[in-house]
Amino acid sequence: MPSAVKLAGPAIHPGKVLADELAVLNVSPSQLARAIDVPVNRVTQILHGRRAITADTALRLGRWFGSGPEIWIDLQTDYELRIAEAELGKTLLAIPVRG
């Protein structure tokens, strides 16, 4: 049975994680875009937190990094849950736990 758990820490957009990884590898956004066959603006929008990582992008990133898509989808899901939790605030706390 699911339990209510407050997510810890700030919401970190997966674009920040991607930017950090690219910096370590010394890979530019345009190099990544070419490598995963997407428009460069998709990559730059993700890097700037203006675009979500979709299943399509997660599959491409997972293939290129050799890590699988799950890490990228999980980062996006975690980010969205933290944002939603912060937005719902007291409304969420007012919902009774069944049981």
Which residues make up each language-model segment?
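A general alpha-helix detector
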Residues: 17, 42, 57-60
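The DNA-recognition helices of helix-turn-helix-type DNA-binding domains
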Residues: 25, 39, 50, 65, ...
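Short, basic-rich loop-to-helix N-cap that marks the start of a DNA-contacting helix
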Residues: 50-63
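Short alpha-helical DNA-recognition segment
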Residues: 27-45
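Glycine-rich, small/polar surface segments that engage phosphate groups of diverse ligands
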Residues: 69
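Short, charged recognition helix plus adjacent turn
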Residues: 63, 73-99
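The alpha-helix within a helix-turn-helix
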Residues: 22, 33, 62
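A short, Lys/Arg-rich alpha-helix, primarily the initiator
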Residues: 2-27, 74
